[in-house]
Amino acid sequence: MNKIAKIAALAALALTCVASTACADFNADKSITVISREEGSGTRGAFVELTGVEQKIDGKKVDMTTDDAQITNNTAAMLMTVAGDEQAIGYVSLGSLNDTVKAVKVEGVEATAENVADGSYKIARPFNIAYKADGQSDLSKDFVAYIMSAEGQAIINEHGYVGSNDAAAYAGNGAEGKLVVGGSSSV
């Protein structure tokens, strides 16, 4: 059985609309270059759902991303593509934001961890940890406990995501070994 630990307080994914830092050179007479993530990307899925780009048609969810969108396959490529085109707009996780692009205000609200935490920045979703609950190793349990601890949450906050400020201190269970972890390019 798979278990998903929702980490709403741990790491709200603020899907931040980003534009080139060269926006002073933006030409309103030119077309905007839409940059999107690949189909199947969790970041894309959240973005289209939260912004209304995903619509229900005949009872099925349909991603209405423009066919003209340039597609990138990871966060770094999204940032590089947007940074290289002053007419471009795309989206990344808040914690992935860097100085090569700038966040676009949504409904007049800046994309900050504080605004995500207080709910005023609306384009946000939780990150999740998925693992097998049956037969979970002591090492795996310890890793999840660390992530959810005050120390783990501090790392989340330091990287621009939204962590919980009321988590308990990490106690640890003394487990040692090798743990293989996979996940999103958004973190």
Label every PLM stretch briefly.
Residues 23-187:
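Exported/periplasmic ABC-transporter solute-binding proteins
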